[in-house]
């Protein structure tokens, strides 16, 4: 076959393959154009998830008949000139979207320029047969896309179900709406309104807060910290959830660069690192975080859909984001998720309240009580035997309680109003500490709470190089399940020595331990080494020092903490609560579960019909 020049329509269809993958891609490109046009109101109408019909209407600046004619040509744009390529502030700039969409659909554009008397429309079928005619229309633009991919039926076969395609489109609209709380959005599918968001006219922070409530939910705002960082060429703002308010997937993570939604690996890794001390690896925080950066320091032209970016100094951006999130979390470091308490209140609700008493039948005193089945909160990871801490609970000897908890408190009895977590009143099932504040009761998981306290204390010891070694009178020989675990411990022995653990290889599958951290006291060395070996084996051979420290600290803290089933005196319970009040991130254990639940008195009174 001889070399030949492709036709314009073929070129546009090829270009469409890079830019337009599904109906959501069409909606993204057209809504972004509407935003760039200065719209204050954008309406989206879909039929069959956009496969049959997509209509985007806006009240933006609009177009004249001459602008309409060239707008559907390749590489025509009002947003860019040759001298301004490194200073891009708009969503679109390549001039590819309209001709690419037109090449694979039946398109009708109707538009009226602001302050113009006349409106015009242009009709294209598969990118050809351009027809411009006068029309009747308000100021702004309306674009109708029918029979998407009719010109490329092979692409049509690759589309997913209507439900899946619709979900992708809703996600696109939500992201753009979050970035522009000043714009009103509506999304209708097959005659049903899915989204209706009113544009906000408040200050910037309150605009964003209200839009987040409308899109993500009020629960998120109640369980989130506000991020606010500013420098001459960089700023970060938004909301990120406290560690105990989390999800099983990353779907509710919204990241923006200069108001452009992105799925950037660098930012996602930074988010994960910021939470690594406070959350299980299979749980994800919720966030809506906006990075504003000088356009000359970020390249948005590295991906066909502009979903990825390239930073001039990626490490600077990464570290700045991590620090900003950690600073925001520290402002609410003692708080546990409010949804946990709400779920607990639901458990106590009496199904017979406000109902007529059933007096027609005598009470059967011999009937068996119904089984109590507690509900599971969707934000709390289920207890699983795979977590080393949970496996330890039944096998650990009595762990040493740190000196502050052991000391007797000689002061007068503590009053409920003195402290945020209140005064201890009782211990339930030798596992939960019940305390009372002025307007609530607090239920604390003693093992989870002390594990967090130990984690923070050991972490500080390691950071400040204050971890003291304790030589074992009789070195402990630990036999491991396989040679791999013994090897990985031995290969990291120098790093482990700095963390208070001295060991040597002893045969193919065994390790001999000569020193342990003094803070751990009289612990089960066999179990400590086996758990540590399991942790490191999961990470592979080339484990980084920071990750090693994380695993070691986590393992130490678990062995160090008060176990469930340990009876505590009133002084010990109060000492534990006071330590929690003075320790960062004591609202959640090392796995992201809450260490305490607070039940407000007003909610308890409502349960009994008092209010």
From Swiss-Prot:
Pfam families: DNA_mis_repair, HATPase_c_3, MutL_C
Ranges where the record places region Disordered: 364-384
GO biological process: mismatch repair
Gene Ontology, cellular component aspect: mismatch repair complex
Entry keyword set: DNA damage, DNA repair
Origin: domain of life: Bacteria
KW Ribonucleoprotein (keyword) present: no
Intrachain disulfide bonds: none
SMART domains on file: DNA_mis_repair, MutL_C
GO molecular-function terms, A-Z: ATP binding; ATP hydrolysis activity; ATP-dependent DNA damage sensor activity; mismatched DNA binding
Alphabetized InterPro entries for the sequence: DNA_mismatch_repair_CS (IPR014762), DNA_mismatch_repair_MutL (IPR020667), DNA_mismatch_S5_2-like (IPR013507), HATPase_C_sf (IPR036890), MutL/Mlh/PMS (IPR002099), MutL/Mlh/Pms-like (IPR038973), MutL_C (IPR014790), MutL_C_dimsub (IPR042120)
Stated family: Belongs to the DNA mismatch repair MutL/HexB family.
Function: This protein is involved in the repair of mismatches in DNA. It is required for dam-dependent methyl-directed DNA mismatch repair. May act as a 'molecular matchmaker', a protein that promotes the formation of a stable complex between two or more DNA-binding proteins in an ATP-dependent manner without itself being part of a final effector complex.
Name recorded for this polypeptide: DNA mismatch repair protein MutL
Species of provenance: Rickettsia bellii (strain OSU 85-389)
Gene (UniProt): mutL
């Amino acid at each position: 076959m001889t070399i030949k020049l492709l036709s314009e329509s073929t070129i546009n269809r090829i270009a469409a393959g890079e830019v337009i993958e599904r109906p959501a891609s069409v909606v993204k490109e057209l809504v972004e154009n509407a935003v760039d046009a200065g719209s204050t109101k954008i309406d989206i109408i879909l039929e069959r998830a956009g496969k049959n019909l997509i209509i985007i209407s806006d009240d933006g600046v609009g177009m004249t008949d001459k602008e309409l004619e060239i707008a559907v040509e390749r590489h025509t744009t009002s947003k860019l000139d040759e001298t301004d390529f490194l200073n891009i502030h708009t969503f679109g700039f390549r001039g590819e979207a309209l001709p690419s969409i037109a090449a694979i659909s039946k398109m009708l554009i109707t538009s009226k320029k602001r302050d113009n008397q006349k409106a015009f429309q242009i009709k294209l079928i598969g990118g050809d047969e351009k027809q411009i005619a006068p029309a009747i229309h308000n100021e702004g633009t309306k674009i109708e896309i029918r029979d998407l991919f009719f010109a490329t039926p092979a692409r049509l076969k690759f589309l997913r179900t209507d439900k899946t395609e619709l979900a992708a489109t809703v996600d696109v609209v939500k992201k753009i709406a979050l970035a522009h709380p000043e714009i009103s959005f509506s999304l209708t599918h097959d005659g049903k309104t899915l989204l209706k968001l009113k544009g906000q006219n408040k200050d910037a922070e309150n605009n964003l807060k209200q839009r987040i409530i409308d899109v993500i939910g009020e629960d998120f705002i109640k369980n989130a910290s506000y991020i606010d960082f500013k420098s001459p060429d960089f700023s970060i703002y938004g909301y990120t959830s406290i560690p105990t308010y989390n999800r099983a997937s990353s779907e509710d993570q919204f990241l923006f660069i200069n108001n452009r939604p992105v799925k950037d690996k660098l930012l996602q890794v930074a988010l994960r690192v910021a939470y690594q001390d406070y959350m299980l690896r299979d749980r994800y925080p919720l966030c809506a975080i906006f990075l504003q950066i000088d356009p000359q320091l970020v390249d948005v032209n590295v991906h066909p859909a502009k979903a990825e970016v390239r930073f001039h100094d990626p490490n600077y951006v990464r570290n700045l984001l991590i620090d900003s999130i950690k600073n925001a979390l520290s402002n609410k470091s003692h708080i546990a998720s409010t949804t946990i308490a709400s779920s607990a209140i639901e458990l106590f609700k009496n199904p017979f309240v406000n109902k007529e008493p059933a007096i027609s039948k005598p009470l059967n005193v011999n009937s068996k009580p119904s089984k109590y089945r507690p509900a599971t909160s969707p934000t709390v990871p289920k207890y699983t035997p795979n977590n080393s801490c949970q496996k330890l609970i039944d096998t650990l000897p009595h762990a040493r309680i740190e000196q502050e908890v052991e000391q007797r408190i000689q002061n007068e009895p503590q009053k409920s109003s003195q402290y945020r977590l209140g005064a201890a009143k009782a211990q339930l099932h030798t596992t939960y500490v019940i305390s009372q504040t002025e307007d609530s009761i607090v239920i604390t998981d003693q093992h989870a709470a002390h594990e967090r306290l130990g984690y923070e204390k050991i972490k500080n010891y390691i950071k400040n190089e204050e971890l003291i070694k304790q030589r074992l009178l009789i070195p402990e020989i630990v036999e491991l399940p396989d040679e791999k675990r013994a090897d990985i411990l031995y290969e990291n022995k120098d790093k482990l020595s700095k963390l208070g653990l001295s060991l040597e290889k002893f045969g193919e599958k065994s390790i001999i331990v000569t020193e342990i951290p003094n803070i751990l006291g009289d612990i089960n060395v066999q179990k400590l080494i086996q758990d540590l070996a399991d942790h490191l084996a999961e990470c592979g051979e080339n484990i980084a020092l920071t990750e090693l420290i994380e695993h070691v600290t986590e393992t130490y803290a678990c062995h160090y903490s008060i176990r469930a089933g340990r009876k505590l005196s009133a002084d010990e319970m109060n000492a534990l609560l006071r330590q929690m009040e003075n320790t960062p991130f004591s609202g959640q254990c090392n796995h992201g579960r809450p260490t305490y639940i607070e039940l407000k008195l007003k909610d308890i009174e409502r349960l009994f019909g008092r209010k």
